[in-house]
Amino acid sequence: MIEIYYFSGTGNSLHVARQLAKRLPEAELIPIARFGRREAITSTADAVGLVVPIHALGLPWPVKRFLERASFKPGSYKFAVTTRECFQTVFTTMDKLLPRGERFHACFAFEMPVTYVPVFEVYSEDERARVEREMLDHVDRIATIVSRRAVHRPKDHPGWFVLSHMIYPLVRRWFQLVRFPNMERSFYANDSCTGCGTCAQVCLANKIVMRGGRPAWQPNVRCAYCLACFHYCPSHAIQISGRNTTRRGRYHHPSVSAADIAAQKRRA
């Protein structure tokens, strides 16, 4: 039995997890967002995988919290897939969140279409098609390695040592203390909002609630920074103040619906 845990705001990681599960017949997909804040998480599977995005060069905080509280079968085969290139320090961080003596046997990172619109523009249709083709090749290779329970731990390029061990921690800390908190207070819905409630449905942190037919971001609930609300809004009404998002495109994986994203929060 293989359990694949995933976290996905705009569908990239869910799509990759689905493709991987197709190639691993014994695989079961389990959403990380399903688990409550204080819920104990126990797995008895012989193999466990994670398919997750990268936020601010590192793990999304819900994924980190999941690993801190999860209890996997001792000696089980563990693998991780990130849907964005990252430093190998991300995977060593994941190792440290496991019980002493445990580590991820195989780790993989590759690019899916970018979704962090405060910095990047969304990919063109041609770019998305290219990335999709490359993703399928990556998943074929990953499935082969996982099926064999092989060890696969790539190393950073030697020239990246300073970036990964000195610059990365500083940038990550800045995002945590400054960039994300400021952005969290900057979400709003413009006059294009129809009050459909999609944003609240896909919000993986349950931060968004509908009040008087308009979305409201609860200040006492921590944002997951998944941008599902932004990318799935059918009227493109969700904006981020000061981030020039009125001119940015929207993207979610075409095979993943808003209902699929919202379903991650559904309890088993």
Language-model segments: residues:
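FMN-binding flavodoxin-like domain, especially the glycine-rich phosphate-binding loop
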Residues: 2-4, 10-15, 22-34, 43-52, ...
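Amphipathic alpha-helical segments
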Residues: 20-21, 227
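Short beta-edge strand/loop motif at the mouth of beta-sheet-based domains
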Residues: 37-39
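Short secondary-structure transition/capping segments
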Residues: 41-42, 117-120, 213-214, 253-254
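Short low-complexity, flexible loop/linker segments enriched in glycine and/or proline
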Residues: 121-122, 223-225, 254-258
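A mid-sequence, solvent-exposed acidic-amphipathic segment
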Residues: 162-201
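Iron-sulfur cluster-binding cysteine motifs and their immediate structural context
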Residues: 188-189, 194, 198-218, 222, ...
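Long, positively charged, glycine-interspersed low-complexity recognition regions
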Residues: 236-268
